[in-house]
Amino acid sequence: MVLYIMKWDIHPDKADAYLKWTQSAVKRTAVPGVVEFRAYRPASGSSQIAVTYEFDDMAAWAAWQGKEDIQKVLNELHTLAINVTTELWGPSPVVPAPVRPKK
C-alpha cells in the first residue's frame, strides 16, 4: 500500500468558500485507483486539516496524481488554504503488511 498525506490550514478569510468547495472536491478526488480516503481535524477543533489517500501501489498513485481533474482540485485547494504540505509513504520493508489485533 501507498499512503499519500496532505495537511493544511483553512485560510481564515475563506472558511465559508472552503466548506462549499469540499463538497465537490472530495467526490472529485475519491475516484477509481483510490483504495481509501479519510479526513481528520484536531480534537481541539482548530482550522487544521489532514487527509489521507491509500493506493495499492506507486503506479496507482502516479496515475491518480497525473489526472487533470486531480491537479485542478489541488490548485483550487491552494486558493482556499495555507501551509499546504504533502507526504508520500511507501510500504515498510520491516512490516510490509498490516498487523491487526485479534478480536
Predicted regions span which residues?
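Short, well-ordered beta-strand segments in beta-rich or mixed alpha/beta enzyme
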Residues: 2-9, 38-67, 103
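Short, flexible segments with low predicted structural confidence
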Residues: 1-2, 16, 32-34
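Residue-level signal for secondary-structure boundary sites
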Residues: 14-16, 59-61, 94
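Short, surface-exposed ligand-recognition loops at beta-strand->loop->(often short) alpha-helix junctions
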Residues: 9-20
